[in-house]
């Protein structure tokens, strides 16, 4: 280093060392930069490859399911013909897009889902619906001798005009609409069913904490927040969003509704999520009440309401923030501040599912029959 001279400052010395190295044929700096760039290119390529392969996998499962159900798709809107199909094709396995590694096992009937029970479950839906058993969910590795329905398995019920529902005796007073149409169910599987994430142990965010599985109370949630203060964790859904655990002193001066302001004041803030967690442009706050229930509140919506997200922190780990954006579960007793599913008789639902009729004449005929029975459905004048 003597050739650099004692009168050079630090920056000049660094520049001289770099320049000297770059003149060499086997430059260390050139090799390092090339290595880093190569790793970056490889990382981008792997991300693109993963996305494309996952999309291709889902499309392959969808096509496989459609092929297995080709006869079913000719009769699914006529329950009498459908029951005959199920009687002749017991234990036919249909692959699911989600959860990965699970299948729908078709069956003619399930114990505990007789006509009177089906009417009870149909009554959970906001407007008239008729249900019949389609099958139940089993793991792919299940042997042929374990195909029979077991208590607490997820049962798939088919409604009129191809609406698909999921139910389990673990939550007898809940019914989840997992598919607005047959095609949407085959493309998404049980993505709307919150219990499915617990079933396949699909966590929405990964945190390394030995005490996380014991968290139940509000105080334990706040202690967890303090242990991970300032830490950000990527959410599985929505894509590119994250959850950040941090402190915040709330004055609630931005909340115009006095009832909401009072309720928020009795809760404890523990985290926020969104694309811009600390900006005023897009931040959604997470609160826990004294019982450990979790709610979300949009700080940028002064007239907004609290939104029920999860019954507990343990449930929250699996379902994440899905209930803030979308909710597809009907309850016998609707939790306070919980969003209601879109009514299947509403004009929005009719518009949302209209594309099914582009390639499905049975769907169009069944929808015409539904409109004949309930003349106002699918119009702006209909009120749920």
From Swiss-Prot:
This is Protein U3. It comes from Human herpesvirus 7 (strain JI) (HHV-7). Belongs to the herpesviridae US22 family. Pfam families: US22 (PF02393). The gene is U3.
């Amino acid at each position: 280093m003597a050739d650099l001279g004692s009168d050079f400052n630090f920056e000049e010395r660094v520049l001289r060392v770099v320049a000297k190295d770059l003149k060499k044929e086997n430059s260390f700096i050139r090799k390092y930069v090339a290595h880093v760039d190569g790793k970056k290119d490889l990382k981008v390529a792997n991300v693109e490859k993963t996305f494309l392969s996952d999309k291709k996998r889902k499309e392959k499962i969808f096509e496989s399911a459609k092929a297995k159900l080709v006869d079913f798709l000719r009769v699914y809107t006529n329950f009498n013909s459908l029951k005959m199909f199920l009687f002749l094709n017991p234990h036919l396995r249909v692959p699911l897009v989600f959860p990965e590694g699970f299948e729908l096992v078709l069956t003619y009937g399930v114990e505990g889902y007789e006509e009177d029970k089906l009417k009870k479950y149909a009554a959970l839906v906001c407007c008239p619906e008729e249900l019949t058993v389609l099958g139940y969910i089993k793991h792919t590795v299940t042997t042929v001798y374990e195909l029979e329905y077991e208590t607490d398995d997820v049962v798939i019920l088919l409604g009129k005009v191809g609406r698909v529902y999921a139910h389990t005796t673990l939550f007898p007073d809940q019914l989840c609409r997992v598919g607005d149409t047959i095609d949407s169910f085959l493309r998404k599987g049980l993505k709307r069913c919150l219990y499915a994430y617990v079933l396949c142990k699909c966590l929405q965010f990964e945190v390394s904490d030995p005490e996380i599985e014991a968290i139940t109370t509000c105080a334990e949630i706040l202690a967890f927040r303090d242990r991970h203060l300032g830490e950000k964790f990527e959410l599985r859904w929505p894509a590119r969003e994250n959850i950040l655990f941090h402190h915040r002193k709330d004055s609630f001066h931005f909340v115009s509704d006095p009832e909401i302001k009072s309720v928020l004041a009795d809760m404890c803030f523990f985290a926020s999520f969104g694309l811009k967690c600390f900006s005023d442009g897009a931040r959604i706050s997470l609160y826990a009440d004294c019982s450990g229930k979790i709610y979300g509140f949009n700080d940028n919506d002064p007239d907004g309401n609290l939104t029920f997200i999860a019954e507990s922190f343990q449930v929250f780990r699996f379902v994440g923030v899905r209930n803030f954006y979308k909710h597809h579960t009907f309850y016998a007793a609707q939790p306070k501040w919980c969003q209601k599913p879109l009514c299947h008789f509403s004009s929005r639902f009719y518009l949302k599912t209209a594309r099914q009729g582009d390639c499905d004449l049975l769907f169009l005929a069944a929808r015409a029959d539904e409109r004949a029975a309930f003349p106002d459905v699918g119009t702006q004048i209909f009120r749920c």
